[in-house]
Amino acid sequence: NSAEPGSYLLTAEEEALIKTVCSAFKRTAVVLNVGNIIDMKWVDRYQPQAVLYVWQGGQEGGHAAADILTGAVNPCGKLSDTIAADISDYPSTDHFGDAVCNVYAEDIYVGYRYFETFAKEKSKLSLRLWSVLYGFFRGGFEYKNGRYESRTYRFS
């Protein structure tokens, strides 16, 4: 991932599309079908009501995204990556893209481990995005009559 349009940064066309759609509609959900984290500063500029990272969902990814967007399922979950405020916040940026040798200078401190150990202030910069990106569920649910069957739980 490099700080270039079409990699970490949106292309001019992608950003123009988001701007146009967000300004034309009261409610906008931006679906990011990407294979890596991208710059999220555009969220502050265009303020979509929802952002859904669908990552690489495979054969059923489209159905899963449709279920989330239509409210058939709850999108709560944990992010598999830390989405920092800037690409320079990631320690791997300094060593990315060498065609001859990959340098893993971060050791075990990749992703959330790095941010929780060495850069809590950098991850806090992204907290304002979490209500959009983290998948907070504002509803409620309860389980009744749960019982253990085999290796799964069954609820009614």
Residue ranges and their predicted role:
Residues 1-156:
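C-terminal non-catalytic regions of proteins with extracellular/luminal or membrane-system context
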